[in-house]
Each structure stands twice: as structure tokens, then as C-alpha cells.
Amino acid sequence: VKINNELSAPVASTVGVPQGSVLGPILFNCVMSVLPKLLRDFGVGCHTYADDTQFWVSFDEAGDFNNEATARWRISQAFGIISKFMLENHLKLNPKKTQFIPFSRKTDAIDFAPLALSSDVSISPSSEVRNLGLIMDSKLNFHAYVSDLRRNCFFHLKRLKAIRCFIPQGQFATLVHAFITSRLDFCNSVFYRLPDNLISRIQTVQNSCAKCLTGKKKYDSATQARIELHWLPIRARASFKILVFAHKVVHQSDNAPAYLSSAFSTTKHSRITRFNCDNTLKGFFTCRLSTVGARS
């Protein structure tokens, strides 16, 4: 371990490292990096984040028994691959933390039976799952996530209001950003296409924070408070984040993900146009129907 210019004495590691060691997360990621390739070779999509592993199987026509049976078989085989992989690497699969959720259109109702992980362990389909802090439901309407977000934000705002008179304004603003607005900005790209009734519920949280920071009263204008703080409304804030991210991807910025940058291709016109730019994007496909899959 090297900190600044100081280097610790070398220690031989034959099996693993003590829990809490700085090498623990790195070595764990090295071991788990093999798992996504094993699942993708089997035709199952997968991605990992630290100790959180997610895999999925997609199929068409929810009412088709053959497609559904094939998907269930592939999921069961994927669980077998994961169990075998963990057994070989001295790890243990925790059935209590293992969940699966079927996603479908609002018009298609999928009634999945419990999946068997082993001869004595099975898991039932969940209506809601937490994906790295984001609560996802089977219809992707995010009602549960909005309710959970409001509950947590107002809980912290109530506690911060109790100590506001003891903290300078600058430090109080830092606490509000750390405990509340950071939650509003987390995964706020999903707010872009939410209906107005859900956006208004999230907007009340931002309005309360703005009034608290500017010293406004309950019935004062929240718009004026946001203007004083240079805050965009929730929907505009989500749009701005998406536009900034898209600009980085299109212009091949250093911190733009390569898997997204490679999906965009530019073209050059054969004649001079009013908009003469080297970064003109090629046209993308258009959707005839406004379905969930098309909007994504």
C-alpha cells in the first residue's frame, strides 16, 4: 500500500485479504469480472456494479407460452451458472437478497410463477425492486420511487429546519445540497417523461428546499425563491442534465462513455449548407407507435 511517498512492507497473500483491506474491493472486482462473460456467452444480458449483479432475458409476445418457457429456462440456467461460479470461488449466493421482476407493457399482464434456484429454494416475482437506489416497478411508472424520494427528502428537511438557527447560511446550504438536492439529482433522467402529477409531487420538495434556504414563508412564491438560487425546475433540470450528457457523447468528450459515443456516427454533406458542421449526425430511426419500448 502506498500513501503519498510512503510504501508499506510487502505481505504475501495466498488465499485472500482481511475484511476491510484496501485490496478487498479490487480483488473482488477481479474475481467477479469473469461472471458477465459467462452469462453473455449463454445469451443472457448482464452487468455488475461492485457486489450487485444483474442479468436479464428479453422475449416478445407475453402470451406466447413457448417464449415464456424459454425465458424461464434461460433464467434457471443462468442461476445455475452463477451458483457454480460462486461455489468454485468460495462465495455464497444469498437467496434472501436475490430478486427477479418481469417488465411488460401496461396492456400485457405477465403472470410469472416462482423460479426455482435449487431443489429447496425458490423466489417469487417482485412488483418492485431497488436498482442501486432507484426503485423500479414492473410497469416502469416510478410511483413507488417518487413516494420514497418525497418521504426521505421531507424527513431530512424537517431535521435540518430544527437546527437552521444554529448554523451559518453557507453551511446550511451545504447540508441541504448533501441531504436533499443530491437525492433529487440522483437518476433524475427518469423524470423526463414522467406525467405531470408525479413531477408536481417532486417539485414540492424542491420548492420547500428553496423557501427554506431563502427564508421565505409558507405561502410565498416558490418560483421567486428558485430564481434567487438559480435553480431550474425539476423537469427542466432533468432535460438540462440529458442535454449536457448528450453533448459530451456527441462531441466525444473524455468523460463520455465509450459504449454510447460509438453509437453515434457523423456525416458530411456533399454540398455546402447553411449549417456546415463536421459533427452533423446521421438520421436515426423513427417510431410509428408511442410504446414503452419506442420511447426508451
Where are each of the predicted segments found?
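Hydrophobic/basic alpha-helical segments
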Residues: 1-296
